[in-house]
């Protein structure tokens, strides 16, 4: 039997649904709306296995903040009513047949990346449901990213149009340009156009840095800021070796569960 694993980036979905509600304290409405969303996802994707991955403590910025203290420093805190309603949301999703994985000390992104690449590496189909373009570095013939809200696939043609590089070069791209929304600085003076030019000529940051053929206008910047580039690439890259503590059988989709 062929496998199709769907991984829901839970807070990515929930926060977008919640922010569109007229009354931010009406968590019941948020629950109902997310359930309708999940019903459509289930209908479209027809998964054999499914799981929703949550950042357990969103205010804990994880290991990336330990090596880059400003990382996501300006992230808006989750609204208190929504924070208080997460358990109820997880219960409602469980009743739909979707279990939750809570990150403990690891960023949810790394858990998603580990699970997705592990399954895809065996030739099985994986769909990550998220608007987060950071997942696009994982793209492979059997691993796809679905932006549910824009009704689009974040695929290789999208990455080429958006960034001008290959999915496998995205961490290097962000190492050079930085990620302003997450307070990742990158290399001063290197923006998207320059990063695209560098990564069209060279496979990655290290190849560019080691080459005598790097354009002089970029050589000075890399010479001065190579450690920042390396650090920012490390922060932008997803970990794919997190201990998961469960197997696929545990997240097989068998339909709705009975409410406890």
UniProtKB/Swiss-Prot annotation:
<feature type="binding site">
    <location>
        <position position="185"/>
    </location>
    <ligand>
        <name>K(+)</name>
    </ligand>
</feature>
<dbReference type="GO" id="GO:0017108">
    <property type="term" value="F:5'-flap endonuclease activity"/>
</dbReference>
<dbReference type="GO" id="GO:0008409">
    <property type="term" value="F:5'-3' exonuclease activity"/>
</dbReference>
<dbReference type="GO" id="GO:0030955">
    <property type="term" value="F:potassium ion binding"/>
</dbReference>
<dbReference type="GO" id="GO:0003677">
    <property type="term" value="F:DNA binding"/>
</dbReference>
<feature type="binding site">
    <location>
        <position position="187"/>
    </location>
    <ligand>
        <name>K(+)</name>
    </ligand>
</feature>
<dbReference type="InterPro" id="IPR020045">
    <property type="entry name" value="DNA_polI_H3TH"/>
</dbReference>
<dbReference type="InterPro" id="IPR002421">
    <property type="entry name" value="5-3_exonuclease"/>
</dbReference>
<dbReference type="InterPro" id="IPR029060">
    <property type="entry name" value="PIN-like_dom_sf"/>
</dbReference>
<dbReference type="Pfam" id="PF01367">
    <property type="entry name" value="5_3_exonuc"/>
</dbReference>
<keyword id="KW-0479">Metal-binding</keyword>
<keyword id="KW-0540">Nuclease</keyword>
<feature type="binding site">
    <location>
        <position position="176"/>
    </location>
    <ligand>
        <name>K(+)</name>
    </ligand>
</feature>
<keyword id="KW-0460">Magnesium</keyword>
<dbReference type="InterPro" id="IPR022895">
    <property type="entry name" value="Xni"/>
</dbReference>
<dbReference type="GO" id="GO:0000287">
    <property type="term" value="F:magnesium ion binding"/>
</dbReference>
<keyword id="KW-0630">Potassium</keyword>
<protein>
    <recommendedName>
        <fullName>Flap endonuclease Xni</fullName>
        <ecNumber>3.1.-.-</ecNumber>
    </recommendedName>
</protein>
<dbReference type="GO" id="GO:0033567">
    <property type="term" value="P:DNA replication, Okazaki fragment processing"/>
</dbReference>
<feature type="region of interest" description="Interaction with DNA">
    <location>
        <begin position="189"/>
        <end position="194"/>
    </location>
</feature>
<dbReference type="InterPro" id="IPR020046">
    <property type="entry name" value="5-3_exonucl_a-hlix_arch_N"/>
</dbReference>
<dbReference type="InterPro" id="IPR038969">
    <property type="entry name" value="FEN"/>
</dbReference>
<feature type="binding site">
    <location>
        <position position="109"/>
    </location>
    <ligand>
        <name>Mg(2+)</name>
    </ligand>
</feature>
<keyword id="KW-0255">Endonuclease</keyword>
<dbReference type="InterPro" id="IPR036279">
    <property type="entry name" value="5-3_exonuclease_C_sf"/>
</dbReference>
<feature type="domain" description="5'-3' exonuclease">
    <location>
        <begin position="165"/>
        <end position="259"/>
    </location>
</feature>
<comment type="similarity">
    <text>Belongs to the Xni family.</text>
</comment>
<dbReference type="InterPro" id="IPR008918">
    <property type="entry name" value="HhH2"/>
</dbReference>
<comment type="function">
    <text>Has flap endonuclease activity. During DNA replication, flap endonucleases cleave the 5'-overhanging flap structure that is generated by displacement synthesis when DNA polymerase encounters the 5'-end of a downstream Okazaki fragment.</text>
</comment>
<keyword id="KW-0378">Hydrolase</keyword>
<feature type="binding site">
    <location>
        <position position="190"/>
    </location>
    <ligand>
        <name>K(+)</name>
    </ligand>
</feature>
<keyword id="KW-0238">DNA-binding</keyword>
<dbReference type="Pfam" id="PF02739">
    <property type="entry name" value="5_3_exonuc_N"/>
</dbReference>
């Amino acid at each position: 039997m062929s496998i199709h694993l769907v991984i829901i980036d839970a807070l990515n979905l929930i926060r977008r649904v919640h922010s569109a509600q007229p009354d931010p304290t009406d968590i019941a409405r948020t629950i109902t709306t997310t359930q309708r969303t999940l019903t459509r996802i289930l209908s479209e994707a027809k998964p054999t296995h499914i799981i929703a991955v949550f950042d357990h403590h969103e205010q804990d910025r994880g290991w990336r903040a330990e090596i880059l203290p400003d990382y996501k420093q300006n992230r808006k805190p989750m609204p208190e009513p929504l924070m208080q309603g997460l358990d109820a949301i997880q219960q409602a999703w469980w009743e739909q047949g979707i279990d939750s994985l809570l990150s403990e000390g690891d960023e949810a992104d790394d858990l998603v990346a580990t699970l997705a690449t592990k399954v895809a590496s065996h030739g099985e189909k994986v769909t990550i449901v998220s608007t987060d373009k950071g997942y696009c570095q994982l793209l492979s013939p059997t691993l796809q990213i679905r932006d549910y809200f824009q009704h689009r696939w974040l695929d290789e043609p999208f990455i080429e149009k958006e960034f001008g590089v290959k999915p496998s070069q995205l961490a290097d791209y962000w190492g050079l340009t930085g990620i302003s929304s997450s307070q990742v600085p990158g290399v001063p003076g290197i923006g998207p156009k320059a990063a695209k030019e560098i990564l069209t000529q060279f496979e990655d940051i290290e190849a560019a840095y080691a080459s005598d053929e790097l354009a002089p206008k970029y050589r000075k910047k890399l010479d001065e800021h190579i450690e920042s580039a390396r650090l920012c690439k490390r922060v932008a890259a997803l970990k794919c070796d997190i201990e998961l503590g469960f197997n696929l059988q545990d997240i097989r989709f068998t339909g709705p569960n009975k409410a406890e």
